[in-house]
Each structure stands twice: as C-alpha cells, then as structure tokens.
Design a protein with these regions (language model features):
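Detector for C-terminal structural segments
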Residues: 2, 42-43, 214, 288, ...
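Surface-exposed binding/hinge segments that line
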Residues: 43, 110, 144-189
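N-terminal lobe/hinge region of extracytoplasmic solute-binding protein
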Residues: 51-102, 133, 203
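Gly/Pro-rich hinge or "lid" segments in bacterial periplasmic/extracellular proteins
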Residues: 179-232, 236, 365-366, 370, ...
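Ligand-site clamp/hinge motif
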Residues: 196, 225-270, 423-425, 431
Length: 613
C-alpha cells in the first residue's frame, strides 16, 4: 500500500536560503496538526494487536538495544529528522526544517510552534538539547545511541524553536536522524535516568504512547491525541506476549491478534492460503550472522568474558567462517526466503551494499583444514584438533530459544565444524540472556542479527574500539567486541566524506575489513516474513513502498496509518485527518513554492545528501 504520509523534498542543504524555502514548502505540504491536533480516536475504534515473541530488554530509550523494544519505542518518540515510508527518505520529524553552515559543521534545526507532548506540555528545542546533552554528559546513557554523537561538540537551544548542533568536523550523516527525543520535564528530575523503567503512564511525541508494560501482560499503547500529524485512526497498539511463534500463529488463525512477524519459512508458507489472512515477505533490512569472539575487552582494553583464547588467532576465526555453508542455510533453513549475503549492509540499501563475488572466507572446508594445519593446530586421533596448550579445540555455540531457526542452523553448523576438527556444544537461551552474555564476552560463537538503518554510520560505529563496553556491560555498545585502529580510521573517513560515490566506496571497504577479520560471519539477509488479518485491516503501509516490510520499519508508519476494513474511504491523506482545508492548502502551497525552490536550487547549486539485537 502506498503511504499517505507527506513526503516533502530532502532538506539537507548547504544553502540556508534553499533550506528555508523548502522548509516553507514542507510546512505548507504537511497537515495543520501542529496548530490544531486531531481529536483522539473514537471510543469504539479498535486497537491493533500484535504478537510479542521476542524479549523486551527495557523501554528506556537510552539503554534499549533489542529489536523488539526498538519497534515499540519508534511509535512513542520521534527524532528531529525521520525516515519516510516511501523510500526511507529524510522527512520532518520533531523538526520541520534544517540547514547546515557552509563548512558543514553547524546544523540548525527549526521546530514548529504549537506542537505538544502527549501530556499537553509544549515540545521545544530545550527537550532536544537536554536529550543530546544527557547522552554526551552521562556514560550510563550512551548504550543505545552514544556512538551517533561521536562528532558532536555542543548542542544548544537558541530559543524554543531553534536547536543548533555544532560538530568537530563535517559529517555525512544528518545528526538529527535516529536519536529519539525525550521530554525534559519528565526525565530531567530523575535521580537515575539510566535505571528508569519508562513502563507506565509514559509521555511521548509519536503517534502512540506506552500506558503499561509487564512481561506477562505485554505492552499496551494508546493513541496520542496531540500527535502533530494528527491522531491515528485506531485507539492504540497492544503487544500480546506468546511463548513462541507457533502459539502466535495459532492466535492469528483464531483472531486473537491481528499481526504476526518473525515467522519461520514453514509458518509463512502454511499461512499463505489461509482464509482472511494475508502474508507479506518484505525485503529484509536485517542480516543474520554468527558472531565470533575475537577476545573481548572492556573500554579501557582490559580482557573480559570467557571466550576461548584460540579464537584470538585470526586463522582459527577465518577457518570457522570457511566451515559454514551459508548457501545451504539459506536454502534449507530459510527455504530460500532471503538473499545471499556479503557484508553487513543488506541489498535493500544499494548505495552501501558490498556487492562482490570476491569472498575468500566463503564455504571451503578443505581450505579451512589447510589453514588450521598451517597454523599448528594438530588433529587428534578422535578427529578433534588440539589448541596451542594441547587441549581439545572445543567451542560453544549460543542461540535464542525463541527463534526456531537458531536450533535448525546449529544442527548444520555443529557437524560442519567437526569436519575441520572443532568440537561444538550448543546452548539455546532466552534472548535477553544471549544479549547479556554477548555484551560482556561470555561466548565463543553466537547467532546474532542487526536491523540496519538507511545510513550505515551507526552500524559501522559500533565496530570501533571506542564502542567497547564497561566490564559490567554498561556504557557503549559493541557489535562483536572488535577493535582495530585501522578500522577506526576508515570509519572516521567515511563518517566525514561528503562525496556520495567516495563515501559508498569507503563503507564497502569497512565491510570488507570486518569480513576478513572474521568476527562476524554474515549468513544471509532474511526476508521479513509477516502475516495479518485482512478481514479486519486494509493493506498496511510498507517501507519502502515497493516490496517493503510492515513491521520493523524505520518509523511508525504501518501502525500509524492502520485502517480497519471499511474505513479506507475515510482515511484520505494524513493531511486530511484534520480538515480538507489543510490538504488543499498543503497541495496548493507546495505547488506555489515549487517554482521558488527550483529557482533557488538552480541559482545556488546546493548539494543534497542523502540503524541491535
């Protein structure tokens, strides 16, 4: 379904004149919700019910890194700059427009007047200033998004509608994206903001806010009547917990819930011909991988965790990678419902996807055995190699007990590693435990996966040495405990490169470096397998519009625009949720300004520029 969300032109311009003109165009094209929010959904409006099969780590946006929680929090908090549903393009979020200085180091964001938090308090630039500075000044609040601010020198609210972010150097990524802004009047007086659960009667800026959460009852969210784009057409979103995906699928069949995501291929195929149910295999923005512990260290370089020391040897890590047949896992476990992988950036982002046939660590057990032989790992009489201390080379493989594909993959991986003389013990744990253990280095191998955002900067940033956590797991977040100063330099180069072609090449080089370090064996890019009750709901907005996903979007769009069957004629454009006048003004305004914008763009020749589990 094509979204009705307003999608103004990109607003990243070096010319303040052009930015101002486009800001005007965007303001005219967007709904008049900032001035007069729509009334809340009617009392009889349904709530959208989704299956919750993954773990919630915390609903604190400064700390949460699990994918399931991120899906919840994206409905509650907006960043300054959002990603649109049409093509993951930059669109207004909490800010209505933005501009940069000529040297690219000063970004000025303008917030509209009259927008409100869900409790009725005004949204101001001071909220954004407090959020950014809280992360910059408190190491305990850096876990989720600290790496996004590596180049930020200062953040200041000049007045209630103007926020200025000053960078130490120009950077390619818009500093207003990704980071959720929280209400200062709720968070500033907390004695321990890092320990705040944020799980009851919360306050947000997005289309829905959390009313309550507990592990047994799930998450209950209600529509935000003050949402600046206009209130949603549903009363809220409820995340109903199920022990596993089989139970969730049965609940979808009986009508207990409306949407299930994270389906296994077998479940997806079984639902394809079910009456009143529609399936969607969206192009995935996630990669599936096996993380390999290279010797975890804390932020100050102190060894931590209980990883097998043999994995500190690059030859062993590379041999492990070569022993794993990703093509077989894609065909047998995923039933082909995905794409072959190279690096960490999926094919859905062609600007940064590492498209190469030169993969020296592809499946090759003979080469893996030769590598281990040459590295001095002798084969024992029982077919298990000996490490450098003369002990059998045995590794632990950890996965999530909530994901059936993890055990299925482990059943393949164990004998494959045996073929190269490595014994493997397999243990499936709760998702939260897998996260905790992997964070502090208590693993050898583990199944992992990350949802990737439209810009690769964050994903690359969590591979820097500075992304390593404290000994207790607090502080920064590291993808796989990788640290290489040469990679850090490459990250900084792509981070600051404003030429798109050059930056794309640097991003691909960075993926190549991670690949050859063999700390992350990327297996495949899985399609997002979802199903919903089409007897109750009109087709959902997908992101991107062509072949995209319903759940796990970079934004709230599918939930915000959810429309019960029979009400599609009332949906109209989002701008129409307040009044037809708003829509007419928006369209007319955009047309009137278009000529001015085109003129300014031609005249100034301003260059435009273009997300763990």
């Amino acid at each position: 379904m094509t979204p009705n969300i307003p999608h103004p032109p990109r607003l990243r311009f070096r010319s303040s004149t052009a930015a101002a003109a486009l800001g005007l165009a965007a303001a005219l094209a967007l709904p008049a919700a900032a001035a007069a929010p729509a009334a809340a959904a009617e009392d009889n409006a349904p709530a959208l019910k989704l299956a919750l099969t993954g773990d919630i780590d915390t609903l604190n946006p400064f700390i949460s890194i699990l994918a399931t929680t991120s899906n919840v929090l994206r409905l509650q908090y907006e960043p300054l700059v959002a990603y649109g549903a049409e093509a993951n393009e930059e669109i207004p979020g909490m800010a209505e427009s933005w501009e940069t200085s000529e040297d690219g180091t000063v970004w000025t964001f303008t917030l509209p007047e009259g927008t409100k938090w869900s409790d009725g308090e005004p949204i101001t630039a001071e909220d954004a200033e407090w959020t950014y500075n809280a992360i910059l000044d408190n190491d305990d609040l850096k876990q989720a998004n600290g790496s996004l601010l590596s180049s930020v020198e200062s953040v200041e609210a000049e007045d209630e509608t103007t926020l200025v972010i000053t960078l130490s150097e120009a950077q390619a990524v818009n500093p207003g994206t990704e980071l959720p802004i929280v209400p200062e009047h709720v968070w500033a007086d907390l004695e321990d903001p890092a320990g705040y659960g944020n799980d009851k009667d919360t306050v947000g800026s997005g289309p829905f806010v959390v009313d309550s959460y507990d592990k047994a009852a799930g998450v209950t969210m209600s529509a935000n009547p003050n949402y600046w784009r206009g209130a949603a057409k549903i009363s809220g979103v409820t995340w109903v917990p199920y022990k596993n995906s089989d139970a969730a699928v049965q609940a979808l069949r009986t009508g207990e819930i409306d949407i299930v995501s994270g389906l296994t291929p077998a479940q997806f195929q079984a639902l394809e011909n079910e009456p009143n149910i529609t399936t969607n295999a969206g192009t995935g923005r996630r990669y599936q991988a096996i993380g390999i512990n290279p010797g975890a260290q804390t932020a100050d370089g102190t060894p931590m965790g209980d990883g097998n020391p043999a994995l500190q040897d690059l030859a062993v890590r590379q041999a492990v990678a070569m022993a794993i047949d990703s093509d077989t896992l894609l065909a047998k476990v995923l039933q082909g419902l995905g794409d072959k992988a190279t690096g960490e950036i999926p094919m859905t982002y062609p600007l940064y996807h590492w498209d190469t046939d030169e993969l020296p660590l592809a499946y090759n057990p003979d080469a893996a055995n030769k590598l281990l032989d040459e590295a001095g790992y002798e084969m024992g009489a029982d077919g298990i190699r000996l490490d450098k201390e003369g002990k059998p080379l045995s590794l632990r493989l950890m996965g999530r007990n909530s994901d059936p594909t993890h055990q299925q993959m482990a059943d393949y991986v164990k004998p494959w590693l045996r073929e190269i003389g490595i014994d493997t013990s397999v243990e499936m744990k709760a998702a939260a435990q897998v996260n905790d253990d992997s964070t502090v280095g208590n693993y050898d191998l583990y199944f992992t996966g990350w949802g990737i955002g439209p810009d690769p900067d964050y994903q690359l940033s969590i591979n820097q040495c500075s992304s390593r956590p404290n000994a207790d797991g607090t502080g920064a977040t590291s993808e796989n405990n990788y640290c290489d100063p040469a990679f850090d330099e490459l990250f900084k180069a792509q981070h600051a490169e404003l030429d798109q072609e050059k930056r794309s090449e640097l991003v691909m080089q960075a993926q190549d470096m991670i690949y050859n370090a063999a700390v992350n064996k990327v297996l495949y890019y899985a399609n997002s397998l979802e199903a919903y009750r089409s007897d109750r709901w009109e087709p959902f907005v997908t992101q991107p519009a062509e072949g995209g996903v319903i759940t796990s979007q970079n934004g709230p769009w599918s939930y915000y625009e959810a429309t019960p069957v029979g009400e599609l004629s009332d949906a109209g454009a989002v701008a129409d949720s307040n009044s037809n006048t708003g829509l007419v003004i928006g369209v007319a305004g955009a047309v009137l300004v278009a000529g001015l914008v085109a003129f300014l763009l031609i005249r100034r020749r301003s260059a435009t520029a273009d997300d763990r589990e």
